[in-house]
Amino acid sequence: MKELITQKLREIEKENKVRILLAVESGSRAWGFASPDSDYDVRFIYARTREDYLLFDDVRDVIELPINDALDINGWDVQKTLCLLYKSNPTLFEWFSSPIVYMETPFAERFRNIMMEYFSQKKSLYHYLSMAEGNYREYLKGDIVKAKKYFYVLRPVLACRWVLSKHTPPPM
């Protein structure tokens, strides 16, 4: 599957005239509790051409591929990524700490080195608490609940605990 994902990422680069700087797995596979029917949640950061950044027209800052049963692929432009870092976006911190990396350039390591300067415990706690509450409402209110769905509530609660005790972004 890794070869197929890498091939799809190369196609994205070619079709969109971008360069992928980092591509990782996000979701249950990266969290370590994938089920046999889990899809691949591939997330990436990309850079457009220099000319694109000099345009006065708005250029879309997200690339999303249609979701199928096996693959869910989307990415953010590096400019959007920088804005999200400034806002201490917890999802961004997760992507850069994913244990499953499909593509990586030297940019990724340089970016990791500055991320902690922008980490906000408060924003992280709000994010994970909101995620736990939303997942609880969506997944645990039914009569029959799959065991995996409990992890979708437990993981953000444990992330909050990590942030409160370690004062750092939680590991993926």
PLM ranges: what are they?
Residues 1-24:
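Helical scaffold of the NTase/Pol beta-like nucleotidyltransferase catalytic core
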Residues 19-22, 41, 161:
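Beta-sheet entry/capping signal
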Residues 26-27, 74:
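Short His-Asn-centered micro-motif
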Residues 27-68:
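Catalytic metal-binding acidic patch
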Residues 48-51, 88-91, 134, 159-160:
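Short loop/turn segments at secondary-structure transitions that flank enzyme active sites
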Residues 55-131:
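A basic- and aromatic-enriched beta-loop-alpha substructure that forms the phosphate/nucleotide-
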Residues 112-172:
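Conserved nucleotidyltransferase catalytic core and NTase-mimicking acidic/glycine-rich helix/loop elements
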